[in-house]
Regions:
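N-terminal extramembrane/targeting module of integral membrane proteins
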Residues: 1-48
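Local cysteine-cluster metal-coordination motifs and their immediate loop/turn environment
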Residues: 40-67, 89-104
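Rieske [2Fe-2S] iron-sulfur-binding domain
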Residues: 63, 68-89
Length: 154
C-alpha cells in the first residue's frame, strides 16, 4: 500500500506469528502490533504491564532484520532491558522494548524472545544489596536506641 504521497508504507514482519503488517512511517511498534491482534506479552504480563510507558520491560522484542530502520535505544530503555533491580539480564544489541520502537522502514521482529541472566552482574547486585541492607538495619537499631534513651525507657 502507498501513502498519499505515493511512498510505500513500512512492513513489519512478525517471525513467530508468521504475519506481516503495514504501518505508517514513525509508528509505535507495540501499538501497531496490538492493533493488528499480535501479542507482544508473555503470560501474566498481558495484564500486568506498564501500558507502553517503557518502565516494565515486558514487551521485549528482538529486531531480527532492519535494526537500522528503527529509532535508537535510549539510556532508559537500555537500563530497563538490563534489569532494574537485583536480577541483571544480558542484552543483545538488537533487543528492544516494542513500546519504545518507532518504525521507519521494513523490519523483521521476534516477539517474546528468550534472554539470559547475567550471573556475574546479578551476584554483584546482590552483594551491594546485602551491604546496604545491613547498614540500614544497623542505622535503624541505633536510631531505636537513641529514641528509647531520649524518652527514658533504657
Amino acid at each position: 500500500m502507498k501513502t498519499k504521497k505515493g511512498e510505500n508504507l513500512p512492513v513489519v514482519k512478525f517471525e513467530r506469528e508468521g504475519r506481516s503488517i503495514e504501518v505508517p512511517k514513525g509508528a509505535n511498534l507495540r501499538k501497531s502490533a496490538l492493533k493488528a491482534g499480535i501479542n507482544v506479552y508473555k503470560g501474566i504480563n498481558q495484564i500486568l504491564n506498564c501500558q507502553g510507558h517503557g518502565l516494565c520491560g515486558t514487551c521485549r522484542v528482538e529486531i531480527i532484520q532492519g535494526d537500522k530502520n528503527v529509532n535508537s535505544k535510549t539510556p532508559m530503555e537500555e537500563w530497563v532491558l538490563k534489569g532494574k533491580f537485583l536480577i541483571a539480564h544480558k542484552v543483545k544489541p538488537n533487543l528492544r522494548l516494542s513500546c519504545q520502537v518507532k518504525v521507519d522502514d521494513d523490519i523483521v521482529v521476534l516477539t517474546m524472545p528468550e534472554y539470559e541472566i547475567d550471573k556475574e552482574e546479578t551476584i554483584e547486585r546482590v552483594k551491594i544489596f546485602a551491604v546496604v541492607t545491613l547498614f540500614a538495619l544497623l542505622f535503624l537499631v541505633g536510631l531505636a536506641f537513641i529514641v528509647l534513651d531520649f524518652i527514658g525507657k533504657l
